[in-house]
Amino acid sequence: MKKISNNIFLIMLIFGTLVTISSNSWLGAWMGLEINLLSFIPLMNDNKKNLLTSESSLKYFLTQAFASSILLFAIIMLMFLYNNNLSLYNSFNEILILSTLLLKSGAAPFHFWFPEVMEGLSWVNGLILMTWQKIAPLMLISYNFIYNFFMISIILSMLIGSLGGLNQTSIRKLMAFSSINHLGWMLLAMMNNEMLWMTYFLMYSLLSFSIVLMFNNFKLFYFNQIFNLSMMNPIIKLLIFLNLLSLGGLPPFLGFLPKWLVIQNLTAMNQLFILTISVCLTLITLYFYLRLSYSIFMLNYQKNSWMLKNNFNNKMSSISLIFNFISIGGLVMISMIYIIM
């Protein structure tokens, strides 16, 4: 019964996003966002015995409900001003709408809820929050943005996403700050090319799915669990290490490709200042990924009895290896296809 209800909520979740991105009015987009929100809340409460999960779902609901209320207020104000032939909405109202959409997507400076909510979720729900739940807000943001306000959000997202992950011991919080950093890159791509941010989002979703699949199969939530896992299987340790570097955007992995496309686009547009800041802040994310990887490879940890159980079945192993191969060697394959063509 629970599985059937979860499938219904998952279908409604997808339906809500499709309603938002296909709507031709702000009110229809708002309704789609609400359907999406009310479908995701039951999915978040997959473990009612875990108080941290209940706390995360409550935080998510309060944050999204507040953003939806402000968005509805801004939409009503927009309709009122438009019907009365007033042009006052051009400044305040656009900032209000953009702020609520940035809050819903978890971009800085409205990111405060995102790491805390991620900490209490399962890996499957965390993956949905990092990927699918960003589609509708980002699509609406692409319709309506203010350059100066947008630029502030981009720089803050990259800065907080980089510095926030430095002293983390929780993998879920690290992935949350990494998502904030990548969101800054998506917004930067959105400023110059509408298709570019979609390409970046697809690549990021693929990389996130690849690494979250491994974390979920091994029930990894904290770094010390990865250290103990390294005593069991060096190959799995290596795959996690390479996936982290790919997610950080280090060449020659697939994660470098979307950043490379954004860098090329910014260079062509002669936006060298924001490009320099973006690359420098991305180096910080690579630093804490490399620091974590160094600890996994070089340091020895005592084997704990609770880590002896291997949850990695053959079916999931095959799926994970396929996605890991794409994540790690995708850029090489794309380069070979490009050379052949």
UniProtKB/Swiss-Prot annotation:
<feature type="transmembrane region" description="Helical">
    <location>
        <begin position="61"/>
        <end position="81"/>
    </location>
</feature>
<feature type="transmembrane region" description="Helical">
    <location>
        <begin position="145"/>
        <end position="165"/>
    </location>
</feature>
<keyword id="KW-1278">Translocase</keyword>
<dbReference type="GO" id="GO:0005743">
    <property type="term" value="C:mitochondrial inner membrane"/>
</dbReference>
<feature type="transmembrane region" description="Helical">
    <location>
        <begin position="174"/>
        <end position="191"/>
    </location>
</feature>
<comment type="function">
    <text>Core subunit of the mitochondrial membrane respiratory chain NADH dehydrogenase (Complex I) that is believed to belong to the minimal assembly required for catalysis. Complex I functions in the transfer of electrons from NADH to the respiratory chain. The immediate electron acceptor for the enzyme is believed to be ubiquinone.</text>
</comment>
<keyword id="KW-1133">Transmembrane helix</keyword>
<keyword id="KW-0813">Transport</keyword>
<feature type="transmembrane region" description="Helical">
    <location>
        <begin position="8"/>
        <end position="28"/>
    </location>
</feature>
<feature type="transmembrane region" description="Helical">
    <location>
        <begin position="272"/>
        <end position="292"/>
    </location>
</feature>
<dbReference type="GO" id="GO:0006120">
    <property type="term" value="P:mitochondrial electron transport, NADH to ubiquinone"/>
</dbReference>
<dbReference type="InterPro" id="IPR003917">
    <property type="entry name" value="NADH_UbQ_OxRdtase_chain2"/>
</dbReference>
<comment type="similarity">
    <text>Belongs to the complex I subunit 2 family.</text>
</comment>
<feature type="transmembrane region" description="Helical">
    <location>
        <begin position="195"/>
        <end position="215"/>
    </location>
</feature>
<feature type="transmembrane region" description="Helical">
    <location>
        <begin position="95"/>
        <end position="115"/>
    </location>
</feature>
<dbReference type="Pfam" id="PF00361">
    <property type="entry name" value="Proton_antipo_M"/>
</dbReference>
<keyword id="KW-0249">Electron transport</keyword>
<dbReference type="InterPro" id="IPR050175">
    <property type="entry name" value="Complex_I_Subunit_2"/>
</dbReference>
<keyword id="KW-0812">Transmembrane</keyword>
<feature type="transmembrane region" description="Helical">
    <location>
        <begin position="321"/>
        <end position="341"/>
    </location>
</feature>
<dbReference type="GO" id="GO:0008137">
    <property type="term" value="F:NADH dehydrogenase (ubiquinone) activity"/>
</dbReference>
<dbReference type="Pfam" id="PF06444">
    <property type="entry name" value="NADH_dehy_S2_C"/>
</dbReference>
<feature type="transmembrane region" description="Helical">
    <location>
        <begin position="238"/>
        <end position="258"/>
    </location>
</feature>
<keyword id="KW-0679">Respiratory chain</keyword>
<keyword id="KW-0520">NAD</keyword>
<keyword id="KW-0830">Ubiquinone</keyword>
<dbReference type="InterPro" id="IPR001750">
    <property type="entry name" value="ND/Mrp_TM"/>
</dbReference>
<protein>
    <recommendedName>
        <fullName>NADH-ubiquinone oxidoreductase chain 2</fullName>
        <ecNumber>7.1.1.2</ecNumber>
    </recommendedName>
</protein>
<dbReference type="GO" id="GO:0045271">
    <property type="term" value="C:respiratory chain complex I"/>
</dbReference>
<keyword id="KW-0472">Membrane</keyword>
<dbReference type="InterPro" id="IPR010933">
    <property type="entry name" value="NADH_DH_su2_C"/>
</dbReference>
<keyword id="KW-0999">Mitochondrion inner membrane</keyword>
<keyword id="KW-0496">Mitochondrion</keyword>
